[in-house]
Amino acid sequence: FKEGDIMLPPGKKAFVLSQDDVCYYEYMDGDGFASRMVIGEDGKPTCEMKLDDGSVVTGDYDLVPILNRFIEEHPGFSYKGAKGVLAFTGYNGILGYRTAASYSESPTYESDREMAAAVAQCLRDDGWELASHSWGHRNMGQISMENFITDTTKWENEVDSLIGPTDIILYPFGADIGDWRLYTTENERFNYLYAAGFRYFCNVDSNQYW
């Protein structure tokens, strides 16, 4: 890593926008959240929501379509089409599709995986970055190394296989695998994640860096 200048048009400020847990977990059903992300009639990612009467509507029901709508009205907000970072766990599937191996007996399992992969590619094409949030929403700095490896392997098998390679991880719980100092090759967890292809290691934290 080497610090440098971020070149932007005058008056613009760089910041990182991220959303984790973009999975639409089962526990969220019936609580006013979107149920899943889909590809809209315009070819852009949007959200479905199930209403109390059982009907399904499509619209701006989460960050992705809300931000896309804002950028349509304020194109100067997005520099060269950049959007944000969306991070996924895997234990309940991704994007509202039950893609985890635990759902493999479901009659919609294969179609869910196909649809999730298509939506993930649509997000990439639309300027979004995709990232890991661990497979099981684990504290990656506190779990045993054995569980750390198991979690990362599950994420590779059940999520990476759908969204394609990513080099970004957003740690759950605002946790970290080190302290405030730079990672070194003496950090076994850093070495493992680096070997798995990760290059950007992010906390869930809105504070300025030190």
How would you label these PLM feature ranges?
Residues 5-6, 191:
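Short, flexible, glycine/charge-rich loop motifs used to bind or transfer phosphoryl groups or to couple energy/partner
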